[in-house]
């Protein structure tokens, strides 16, 4: 894609959500990495990618200046004027609105202002200059929620809505002059002026009337409407709309007949939020499949669950096929995962009782997320249509010789409700699966030899690392499951029962963005845990690489006079097999206790060998077994502690890279790019006087979360997908 042609100036790092770009060099780098072709708004070709770039990443879209576009806009305006000159009665232009459409007026301009007045009813923070009386209660109280973020829409939603509304109006079906559209683009998009819009008040029936009334009021320079602007220090501040217009030398709009109605009557806010949600959901779906592949590696699973026969031949649902292909590709080259092509037939007599297949959270991952991928794709198609549609009423056909006026209900935003509720259900399914994968990962009864709570240190009795995350995951997953409930089943009759059915699309879209926040947190915790688990696997592998030499040397030292070298190698293989199994089974205990049990079990191999000798070997071999156990425990513990120190002294060294498949890029992104280290150094040192100097676990998880929410991680994921 071509570089962005126009980029907005940086704006304030505010506590409010949804601002465009933070001022730090890091944040500017992240924003500039989101590239899109120049967005040209013509009413027919707006893409979700362009909407997101314009809403969140400072891209400045331009209006299509072509003669054809200008002509259809001008023709619709002239058709409307001609009908009014003939004295025709036209809804919303010389009649009342909605259930009051039986009223009539000849003052068409005043009617447009009455519409704005009627709809500007949302609850916002009270500015200090507002003319109010003295408070009757205590003058100060701490708020229960953040007043700004709980009452004011994020700027990204508003910018997106302005882009969508311009796309609709540029189609020439609404009777709104080019001059109005041009000023909208210049004031709001080019000069980065964002109206302050209430979060609540829309039922998305006759479109998002109330939110759009604040946009229209700002364009008209209403003193009671506020806007976010960038001051001389680069900070985002609120000023009145008339002041915002003065700052940028833009004359406020005086609305002609139907123009205020044309700005208000549409699904722009619902479509904006749906578009932003769709983009995030697509990326989170890819991330969920990536963390699933990493979980397969961390749990020593198999790519056989994603074999083409299962998905492409036996049950060819498109989402399932897509997911299995992606996960299988991510596991390519992994030394931790088992591979279908290397699968061995195991005889019943050789089967030692291990799981013959992965558990459901891995084995059925593609069947679980596949339908959600299809739903997200369907939602994307709906949003693509919506942001290139006319959602006004009445509508003017500029190609009809008489400029026929159509009365309909394109503002009923149920298509957006349906889209975001499908997305939300898909997000819930992904979150539930990821949560269960993580509970399996931290549980020593299920994780195939990883230590309890993913503690990387030898003494688990002083390291409960992942336990808090396990609890936090349950909390946020529960919240996500609640958000999965539909909004559309809670419709209330409104506006004198005229709007007896209403889509609630914006409300549902808001819930979907909350669900996106929850799943983003779940994935941030998951990436943190998975990288820790992969480092521990690498630690275990490095220890395991040294054990054959250690065991063979110890057998030679203690039992060389009773067994030749060939027998020593044979016994060593049996001892190592026994040790591997027992170490997996005791991963909830401190290292020394594990090793004592492990060598106790392994000594049965030696007892059996000596008991089968013709002479029994005498008493010396039995005494040597006791010595062998004690020496083995001490020597193995020494190796384990040395390797642990080596790993924790270099917590950013990406110890597991050589073991991973294509997931290596994500693992190294967390360790190197984000600077999130392997955990455990403070536990290894038993918290010796340095506790106050360490970053919290949550602090590091927050770094991963931030990279998801600002899109930096998605850039990495996009590059990874391109390289598969």
Swiss-Prot record:
**One annotated GO molecular function:** phenylalanine ammonia-lyase activity
Q: Name one GO biological process term.
A: cinnamic acid biosynthetic process
Q: How is it modified after translation?
A: Contains an active site 4-methylidene-imidazol-5-one (MIO), which is formed autocatalytically by cyclization and dehydration of residues Ala-Ser-Gly.
Which EC class does it fall in?
lyase
Which InterPro entries does the record associate with it?
Aromatic_Lyase (IPR001106), Fumarase/histidase_N (IPR024083), L-Aspartase-like (IPR008948), Phe/His_NH3-lyase_AS (IPR022313), Phe_NH3-lyase (IPR005922), Phe_NH3-lyase_shielding_dom_sf (IPR023144)
What chemistry does it catalyse, as a reaction equation? L-phenylalanine = (E)-cinnamate + NH4(+)
The listed locations are: Cytoplasm
Active-site residues are: 91
Q: Which keywords does this chain's UniProt record carry? A: Cytoplasm, Lyase, Phenylalanine catabolism, Phenylpropanoid metabolism
- Residues where (E)-cinnamate binds: 265, 357, 363, 393, 467, 495, 498
Q: Where is this cross-link: 5-imidazolinone (Ala-Gly)?
A: 205-207
Task: Name one cellular component (GO) term.
Answer: cytoplasm
User: Which family does the similarity line name?
Assistant: Belongs to the PAL/histidase family.
Q: What does this protein do?
A: Catalyzes the non-oxidative deamination of L-phenylalanine to form trans-cinnamic acid and a free ammonium ion. Facilitates the commitment step in phenylpropanoid pathways that produce secondary metabolites such as lignins, coumarins and flavonoids.
- Protein's UniProt name: Phenylalanine ammonia-lyase
Organism source for this protein?
Mycosarcoma maydis (Corn smut fungus)
């Amino acid at each position: 894609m071509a570089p962005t042609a126009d980029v907005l100036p940086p704006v304030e790092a505010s506590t409010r959500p949804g601002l465009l770009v933070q001022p730090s060099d890091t944040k500017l780098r992240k924003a500039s990495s989101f590239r899109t072709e120049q967005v040209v708004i013509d009413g027919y070709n707006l893409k979700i990618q362009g909407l997101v770039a314009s809403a969140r990443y400072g891209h400045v879209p331009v209006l299509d200046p072509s003669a054809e576009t200008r002509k259809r806009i001008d023709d619709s305006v002239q058709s409307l004027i001609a009908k009014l000159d003939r004295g025709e009665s036209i809804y919303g232009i010389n009649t009342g609105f909605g259930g009051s459409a039986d009223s009539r007026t000849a003052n068409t301009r005043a009617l447009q202002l009455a519409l704005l007045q009627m709809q500007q009813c949302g609850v916002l923070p009270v500015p200090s200059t507002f003319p109010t009386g003295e408070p009757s209660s205590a003058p100060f109280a701490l708020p229960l929620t953040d007043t700004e973020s709980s009452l004011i829409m994020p700027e990204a939603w508003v910018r997106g809505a302005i882009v969508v509304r311009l796309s609709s109006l540029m189609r020439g079906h609404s009777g709104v002059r080019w001059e109005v559209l041009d000023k909208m683009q210049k004031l709001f998009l080019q000069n980065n002026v964002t109206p302050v819009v209430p979060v609540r008040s829309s039922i998305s029936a006759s479109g998002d009337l109330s939110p759009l009334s604040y946009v229209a009021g700002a364009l008209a320079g209403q003193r009671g409407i506020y806007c976010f602007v960038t001051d001389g220090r680069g900070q985002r501040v609120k000023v009145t709309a008339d002041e915002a217009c003065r700052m940028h030398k833009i004359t406020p709009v005086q609305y002609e007949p139907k123009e205020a109605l044309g700005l208000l009557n549409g699904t722009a806010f619902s479509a904006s939020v749906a578009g932003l949600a769709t983009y995030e959901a697509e990326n989170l779906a890819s991330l969920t499949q990536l963390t699933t592949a990493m979980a397969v590696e961390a749990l020593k699973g198999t790519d056989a669950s994603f074999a083409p026969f299962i998905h492409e031949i036996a049950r060819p649902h498109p989402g399932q096929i897509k997911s299995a292909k992606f996960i299988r590709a991510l596991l390519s080259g992994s030394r931790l995962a088992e591979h279908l092509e290397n699968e061995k037939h195991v005889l019943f007599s050789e089967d030692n009782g291990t799981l013959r297949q992965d558990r459901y959270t891995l084995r059925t991952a593609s069947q679980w997320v596949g339908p959600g991928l299809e739903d997200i794709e369907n939602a994307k198609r709906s949003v693509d249509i919506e942001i290139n549609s006319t959602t006004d009423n009445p509508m003017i056909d500029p190609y009809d010789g008489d400029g026929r006026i159509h009365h309909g209900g394109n503002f009923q935003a149920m298509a957006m409700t349906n889209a975001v509720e499908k997305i939300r259900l898909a997000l819930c399914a992904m979150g539930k699966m990821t949560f269960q994968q993580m509970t399996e990962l931290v549980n020593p009864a299920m994780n195939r030899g990883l230590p309890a709570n993913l503690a990387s240190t030898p003494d688990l009795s002083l390291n409960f690392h992942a336990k808090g995350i396990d609890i936090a995951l349950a909390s946020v997953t529960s919240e996500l499951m609640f958000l999965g409930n539909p909004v559309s089943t809670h419709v209330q009759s409104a506006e004198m029962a005229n709007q007896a059915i209403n889509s609630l699309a914006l409300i549902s879209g808001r819930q979907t963005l909350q669900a996106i926040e929850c799943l983003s947190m779940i994935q941030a915790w998951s990436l943190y845990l998975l990288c820790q688990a992969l480092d521990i696997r690498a630690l275990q592998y490095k220890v395991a690489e040294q054990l054959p030499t250690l065991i063979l040397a110890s057998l030679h030292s203690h039992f060389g006079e009773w067994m030749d070298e060939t027998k020593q190698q044979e016994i060593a293989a049996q001892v190592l097999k026994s040790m591997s199994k027992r170490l997996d089974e005791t991963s909830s205990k401190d290292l020394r206790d594990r090793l004592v049990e492990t060598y106790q079990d392994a000594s049965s191999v030696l007892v059996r060998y000596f008991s089968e000798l013709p002479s029994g070997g005498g008493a010396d071999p039995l005494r040597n077994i006791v010595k062998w156990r004690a020496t083995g425990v001490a020597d193995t513990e020494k190796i384990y502690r040395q390797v642990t120190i080596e790993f924790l002294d270099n917590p950013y060294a990406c110890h597991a890279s050589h073991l991973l498949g294509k997931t290596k890029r994500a693992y190294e992104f967390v360790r190197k790019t984000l600077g999130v280290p392997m955990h455990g150094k403070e536990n290894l040192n038993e918290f010796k006087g340095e506790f106050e100097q360490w970053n919290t676990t949550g602090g590091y998880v927050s770094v991963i979360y931030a990279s998801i929410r600002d899109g930096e991680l998605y850039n990495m994921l996009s590059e990874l997908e391109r390289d598969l």
